[in-house]
A protein has these predicted regions:
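Short, glycine-/small- and polar/acidic-enriched structural segments
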Residues: 23-163, 167-173, 177-183, 196-203
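Pocket-lining segment of extracytoplasmic ligand-binding domains
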Residues: 85-86, 165-256
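Bacterial N-terminal signal peptides
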Residues: 5-17
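Secondary-structure end/capping motifs
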Residues: 219-301
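Conserved C-terminal helix/tail region of periplasmic/extracytoplasmic solute-binding proteins
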Residues: 289-330
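A bilobed periplasmic-binding-protein/Venus flytrap-type ligand-binding module shared by bacterial periplasmic
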Residues: 43-44, 109-118, 206-221, 272
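Boundary at the C-terminal end of the N-terminal hydrophobic targeting segment
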Residues: 18-22
Length: 330
């Protein structure tokens, strides 16, 4: 099933709810890619965790983190799941966007090339597929090209293609010479003879939960409930393998068992999806260092400027998170 884009909720929950209780806070939450970066939001929706915490959340897919960020800033989506670079860039422009939960805290993408391109030098003059300019895959593509000794501006043409499935499709059809792909898609491509030239692997705020400081002031209780739902969804991902795989199949589409298993194992690993969900300050620092090459504001910024950890800290210091994992509650 293909996702409905922009202002329409795209999926019905796996478990049935007949009537939305009046006390539930109803709102729209955006996310910017069809990837496991947004696994916690999908799980919170499908398992009923949002509703258990008094939230009726409509999940809306936007093509690319930049578009999802625009929806957040316009207040169409008071909370969004977006990539770290989008949050940092928007904040540097003077907006009041802020990250409230860490989501995925490591980079996970490979620069994959056509079978005939086996060395970086052969990529010169070719095109590289990303999702959207300013999004996570665009940011990581530039980092990957630099690691290969290529100039992202002069040596290649970076093009906007869309989500991971669209990028992989463009690569397979020869429309581009390279694409930024997640680890599972990179493995699939390698089996077909494509080449994974380089991985971008480091502390990196790949995706997280963002809102605005204004929304925190106006609706702190909703923000608190959302962060609690995020924590519980991450726990459910790590402790309910079968439910997790059903959710992945629903949002990512059909895939063979081996690919699904690898995707689930990778997506639920603690180093990628930490139980306590603090944003990674080191990962934000890495984003700032890259942006500082062209943005003087990034040079003077501190990673702490882009996060509000009060809600995570409340849950952590209360013992809630430790108790959740101690009891094994679902």
């Amino acid at each position: 099933m293909k996702p409905v884009i922009f202002a329409i909720s795209l999926f019905l929950p796996l478990s049935f709810y007949s009537i939305v209780p009046a006390q539930l806070a109803k709102m729209t939450v955006g996310y910017g890619s069809i990837s496991t970066n947004h696994f916690p939001a999908w799980m919170a929706k499908e398992s009923g965790i949002f509703r258990e915490n008094g939230l009726d959340m409509q999940l809306v897919y936007f093509r690319g983190g930049t578009t999802a960020m625009m929806a957040l800033l316009s207040r169409e989506t008071p909370i969004s799941e977006v990539a770290g670079p989008s949050i940092v860039s928007a904040s540097l422009r003077g907006t009041d966007v802020v990250m409230i939960a860490g989501g995925v805290v490591t980079s996970d993408q490979w620069l994959v090339t056509r079978p005939e391109i086996k060395m970086a030098e052969q990529l010169k003059g070719g095109s590289v597929a990303t999702s959207i300019f300013g999004g996570s895959s665009d940011f990581l593509a530039r980092m990957a090209l630099k690691k290969l000794g290529l100039n992202p501006v002069k040596d290649v043409v970076i093009v906007q293609i869309g989500g991971v499935p669209e990028r992989l499709g463009a690569l397979e059809k020869g429309k581009v010479q390279a694409a930024m792909l997640g680890i599972t898609e990179a493995l699939m491509a390698q089996k077909k003879g494509f080449n994974a030239l380089v991985a971008v692997s480091q502390a990196y705020q790949a995706a997280g939960v963002a809102t605005t400081r204004r929304f925190i002031r106006e609706s702190p209780d909703i923000v608190r409930k959302y962060v609690k739902s995020q924590i519980e969804a991450v726990h459910r991902i790590k402790t309910d393998r079968e439910m997790g795989k059903r959710v992945l199949l629903k949002y990512l589409g059909p895939q063979d068992k081996e690919v699904l298993q690898k995707r689930y194992d990778y997506s639920s690993a603690n180093d990628r999806l930490p139980p306590k969900q603090y944003p990674t300050l080191e990962g934000i620092k890495n984003i700032l260092e890259s942006l500082a090459e062209t943005d003087s504001k990034a040079k003077a910024a501190n990673p702490e400027d882009f996060v509000d950890m009060r809600f995570i800290k409340e849950l952590d210091e209360s013992g809630f998170i430790d108790e959740l994992y101690k009891t094994g509650k679902r």
